[in-house]
Amino acid sequence: MPEVLLVATPGTRIYVRRGVVYAEAPSGEKAVVTADTELVVLATGSVSVSGRALRRLAELGVRLVVLGQRGQVVAEHRPVDRVNRTIEARMEQYRVKATGEALYYAAEMVYAKIVNQAKLLRYLAKSRREPWLRDAGYRVEGHADRLRQIIENEEPTTPEVIRSIEAQAARDYWDAIAQIAPTPFPGRQPRGEDHLNMALSYGYAILYSIAHDALTVAGLDPYAGFLHADRSGRPSLTYDYADTYKPIAVDKPLLTAPRKTDCLDTYMGALTYNARRCIATLVLENIYKTPYPDSRGRKKTLRDHIYTYAWNLAAAIRQHKPYKPFIVGRL
């Protein structure tokens, strides 16, 4: 099973000894990059990495990503052979963008995202014994039903119609979350400076790094999106694709962790080292270690679903077929 190594202790050294890559904390505690390690995440800026370690990580096929204070990926080191060199999927991706067919792929992704939001609310209703959350979940799912009708009837649509339905669902979803949030929460604001918004943004950035790699490996262009606006340097398709997984990959662990307030500590308007370590640990363990069934009953880790469905998306685009994104099964 693929594994991830999180480096979040300031002063850690990453080096090679006898062909083995070690991450050694100032306390002397060591972690080893094993044959199963797929990803090394640096969640602190106070880390030294030797050139030999970078070379050995590449030889082992291990990606290394560096996260900023808000969780955004500020640097990435990847083996060159992880990039799919075929251009067929990308050529078809650009074609469906030009013809407008991409909107149907976008609509399916937004539909899956809304359904996953609704399922999380119903799960929270059951685990917290709060019936009103179940009602909120069905209210959110009502927006998905409207979008499903547009898709099924092949009605002419525009990005504005899809975004409008997505926004209405998001409002109902985050209004419900605000009532159970562990700290005051004004609703989802990507640049919000309250504790929960900063934690969500940090967790989403970790998810983006994994989704970005999955799309790249599948042969797609992460910067050519279907719904998010294209801008220079903006991985629009990564955002479109990752949205499907946000409720289960990030929202769920942050809202249900026994000591979730540890992930919300801030100092001078930024998440503390301990909070960043807490968020990264929760999100990465949820993605890499917790199995979830999809709507067809196939039980895998979210990491495996993310890569599998990226290949499915690339195949659907190449073969001019419909795409069914990830929808979580029974929670």
Swiss-Prot record:
Function statement: CRISPR (clustered regularly interspaced short palindromic repeat), is an adaptive immune system that provides protection against mobile genetic elements (viruses, transposable elements and conjugative plasmids). CRISPR clusters contain spacers, sequences complementary to antecedent mobile elements, and target invading nucleic acids. CRISPR clusters are transcribed and processed into CRISPR RNA (crRNA). Acts as a dsDNA endonuclease. Involved in the integration of spacer DNA into the CRISPR cassette.
Lineage: Archaea, Thermoproteota, Thermoprotei, Desulfurococcales, Pyrodictiaceae
Cofactor: Mg(2+); Mn(2+)
GO MF, one annotated term: metal ion binding
EC number(s) from the headed UniProt entry: 3.1.-.-
Annotated PANTHER family: CRISPR-ASSOCIATED ENDONUCLEASE CAS1 1
Protein's organism: Hyperthermus butylicus (strain DSM 5456 / JCM 9403 / PLM1-5)
Protein name as annotated: CRISPR-associated endonuclease Cas1
Pfam families listed in its UniProt record: Cas_Cas1
Protein family according to the UniProt entry: Belongs to the CRISPR-associated endonuclease Cas1 family.
Entry keywords, A to Z: Antiviral defense, DNA-binding, Endonuclease, Hydrolase, Magnesium, Manganese, Metal-binding, Nuclease
Top EC category: hydrolase
Transmembrane segments: none
UniProt subunit comment: Homodimer, forms a heterotetramer with a Cas2 homodimer.
Gene it is expressed from: cas1
Binding site for Mn(2+): E166, H228, D243
